[in-house]
């Protein structure tokens, strides 16, 4: 999949109606938006369209999982004033996203108008399947999906996608708008530029840091990374499955992934054949229970982990080893924490890795944080602007790193 796509800055927007797929899937509480980060992230793309003389901007998004029917708590209406506030301009909310009323409102609007459509996922056609209010499974026919996509297409002259977080989903709003120019917005463009830098043309040594719980969840990621990287750090819960298989280490009550265990030796053989250095933890912070007030002690591969105890973070020697590996890398992709960072007692390893990645960035390395938990760590320790790129899409970035095609990216016009 080529990651170089037509960008909004390559398109003449003057006098055009610009239809933008944004990601306004924001956290809500009691009908109020509790975090406006995703809205703020889309503002530069919206502002750019208006500054370049777009006749109108039509914003479409999903919110939550209403499963193909109207659910009031998932309405985008409360999001509208927040968009307006951040944009510094009035935004008109439309009570649906398709149908004659919406098409008429967007047909010939006053120049400079901005509209926000109601939640795309109130229609089963957006995702293709859903669940009815009474709990039965529902499914849209190909003709229904086509009609839904055509109705969305009528709302603009140019299509822009800025919803990287949904790019791995072949939903109607992501792949169905058949306008002559389908460009990426600034957010999507930044994601694609950084991932292309790492996956298509990395400066070496190229290091992947992989954490998280299960080997079996990350197997495609590990296999694809072995084709690309020079070094690989494996931390988090999945390290115990590796250590038990390779060193026959006693891991106590630590996470063990039986299906994942079957592929450990294959991974090690592939790494050897491809000349990839794999780095595993050599010591651990262990705990007698999964809690902040647990008793802890440091254990090694040799000593093993006592029965009833579990490894919840990497130990001081491992931190020292991993820091050396991180400091010599020129390109770093990080997906998954080193330990249970949500509890301060077991956050030391992840925090140390983060500090080292920040240092590497200062020294000129390109550092990319895959979405999900690792992005949460950046927010927790305020390092979002101290690394090259924090991905906004957990699932989408994981699929890119696994070497998969992203339907929402494939659907965009290629850069000339």
Swiss-Prot record:
Alphabetically sorted, this entry's keywords are: ATP-binding, Glycolysis, Kinase, Magnesium, Metal-binding, Nucleotide-binding, Transferase
Q: Report the transmembrane regions from the record.
A: none
PROSITE patterns, per the entry: PGLYCERATE_KINASE
Q: Where does ADP bind?
A: 212, 236, 341
Sites binding Mg(2+) sit at 213, 217, 373
**What does this protein need as cofactor?**
Mg(2+)
Documented EC number(s): 2.7.2.3
Keyword set includes Nucleus: no
Class in the EC hierarchy, top level: transferase
For binding CDP, which residues are annotated in this chain's numbering?
Answer: 212, 217, 236, 336, 341
Reactions this protein catalyses: (2R)-3-phosphoglycerate + ATP = (2R)-3-phospho-glyceroyl phosphate + ADP
This protein's record includes keyword Endoplasmic reticulum? no
Residues given in the record as (2R)-3-phosphoglycerate binding sites:
22-25, 37-38, 61-62, 64-65, 120-121, 168-169
Q: Which GO terms describe its molecular function?
A: ADP binding; ATP binding; metal ion binding; phosphoglycerate kinase activity
Binding of AMP, residues: 213-214, 218, 237, 311, 342
Task: Give the pathway.
Answer: Carbohydrate degradation; glycolysis; pyruvate from D-glyceraldehyde 3-phosphate: step 2/5
Subunit structure of this chain's protein: Monomer.
Function comment? Involved in the seventh step in glycolysis. Catalyzes the conversion of 1,3-bisphosphoglycerate ((2R)-3-phospho-glyceroyl phosphate) to 3-phosphoglycerate ((2R)-3-phosphoglycerate) and results in the formation of ATP. Associated with the tegument to provide the energy needed for the tegumental repair resulting from immune damage.
What protein name is recorded for this chain? Phosphoglycerate kinase
Q: Which organism is it from?
A: Schistosoma mansoni (Blood fluke)
């Amino acid at each position: 999949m080529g990651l170089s796509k037509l960008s909004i800055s390559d398109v003449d927007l003057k006098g055009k109606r610009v239809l933008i797929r944004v990601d306004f899937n924001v956290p809500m509480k009691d009908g109020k938006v509790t975090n406006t980060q995703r809205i703020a992230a889309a503002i530069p793309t919206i502002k750019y369209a208006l500054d370049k003389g777009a006749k109108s901007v039509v914003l479409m998004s999903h919110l939550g999982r209403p499963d193909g029917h109207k659910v009031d708590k998932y309405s985008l209406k409360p999001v509208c004033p927040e968009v307006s506030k951040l944009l510094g301009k009035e935004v008109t909310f439309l009570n649906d996203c398709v149908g004659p009323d919406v098409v008429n409102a967007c047909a010939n609007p006053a120049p400079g108008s901005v509209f926000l459509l109601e939640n795309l996922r109130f229609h089963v056609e957006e995702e293709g399947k859903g669940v009815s209010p009474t709990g039965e499974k529902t499914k849209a026919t190909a003709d229904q999906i086509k009609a839904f996509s055509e109705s969305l297409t009528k709302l603009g002259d140019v299509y822009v996608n800025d919803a990287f977080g949904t790019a791995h989903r072949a939903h109607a709003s992501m792949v169905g708008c058949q306008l002559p120019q389908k460009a990426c917005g600034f957010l999507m463009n930044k994601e694609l530029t950084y991932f292309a830098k790492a996956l298509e043309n990395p400066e070496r040594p190229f290091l992947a840091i992989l954490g998280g719980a299960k080997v079996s969840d990350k197997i495609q990621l590990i296999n694809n990374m072995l084709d690309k990287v020079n070094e690989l750090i494996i931390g988090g819960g999945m390290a115990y499955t590796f250590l038990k298989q390779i060193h026959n280490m006693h891991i106590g009550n630590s996470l063990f992934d039986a299906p994942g265990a079957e592929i450990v030796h294959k991974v090690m053989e592939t790494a050897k054949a491809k000349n990839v250095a794999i780095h595993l933890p050599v010591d651990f912070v262990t705990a007698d229970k999964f809690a902040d007030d647990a008793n802890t002690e440091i254990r090694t591969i040799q000593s093993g982990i006592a029965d009833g105890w579990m490894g919840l973070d990497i130990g001081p020697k491992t931190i020292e080893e991993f820091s050396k590996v991180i400091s010599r890398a020129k390109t770093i992709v990080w997906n998954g924490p080193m330990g249970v960072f949500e509890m301060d007692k077991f956050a030391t390893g992840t925090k140390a890795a983060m500090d080292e990645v920040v240092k590497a960035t200062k020294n000129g390395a390109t550092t990319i944080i895959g979405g999900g938990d690792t992005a949460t760590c950046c927010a927790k320790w305020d390092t979002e602007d101290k690394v090259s790129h924090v991905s906004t899409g957990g699932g989408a970035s994981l699929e890119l790193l696994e070497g998969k095609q992203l339907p929402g990216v494939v659907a965009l016009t290629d850069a000339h």
